[in-house]
């Protein structure tokens, strides 16, 4: 026991803080909250822009009749797409907006308005 204590005293290194007053370098939480919330708030796309881009992607999909594409159109009922076609549309939307839609969310996107709502509320959409 005595040898252990002597060894620890011998190996102990003094550390001096480089900051004179640590409280001076800490930002108040309200400043951090404001800074980060402004970044997130400013990064969402405008819903009308998202709608136009989604409509354009769906109209350019080869299995869709462009005259049937409306903001409320359902992929299966109105546009006649099967589940595999719907997956391809979602993949095209991922490419258009530059982010990956998780599988569990992609399964829920069955219409143009659902796609617009999801993309407009996603902070990574470009």
Swiss-Prot record:
Compartmental location: Mitochondrion
GO CC terms, sorted: cytosol; mitochondrial matrix; mitochondrion; nucleus
Residues bearing the modification O-(pantetheine 4'-phosphoryl)serine: 83
One term of GO molecular function: metal ion binding
InterPro entries, A to Z: ACP, ACP-like_sf, PP-bd_ACP, Ppantetheine_attach_site
Key words of the record: Electron transport, Fatty acid biosynthesis, Fatty acid metabolism, Lipid biosynthesis, Lipid metabolism, Mitochondrion, Phosphopantetheine, Phosphoprotein, Respiratory chain, Transit peptide, Transport
Residues annotated as domain Carrier: 48-123
Transit peptide (residue range): 1-36
NCBIfam families, sorted: acyl_carrier, PRK00982.1-2, PRK00982.1-4
Subunit structure: Complex I is composed of at least 49 different subunits.
Family affiliation: Belongs to the acyl carrier protein (ACP) family.
Protein name in the entry: Acyl carrier protein 2, mitochondrial
Lineage, uppermost ranks: Eukaryota, Viridiplantae, Streptophyta, Embryophyta, Tracheophyta
């Amino acid at each position: 026991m005595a040898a252990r204590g002597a060894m620890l005293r011998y190996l102990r290194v003094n550390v001096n803080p480089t900051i004179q007053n640590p409280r001076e370098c800490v930002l108040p939480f309200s400043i951090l909250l404001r800074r980060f919330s402004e970044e997130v708030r400013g990064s969402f796309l405008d819903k009308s822009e998202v709608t136009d881009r989604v409509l354009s992607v769906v109209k350019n999909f080869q299995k869709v009749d462009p005259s049937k594409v409306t903001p409320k159109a359902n992929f299966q009922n109105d546009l006649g797409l099967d589940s595999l076609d719907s997956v391809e549309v979602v993949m095209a939307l991922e490419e258009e907006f530059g982010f990956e839609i998780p599988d569990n969310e992609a399964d829920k996107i069955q219409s143009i308005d659902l796609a617009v709502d999801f993309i407009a509320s996603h902070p990574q959409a470009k």
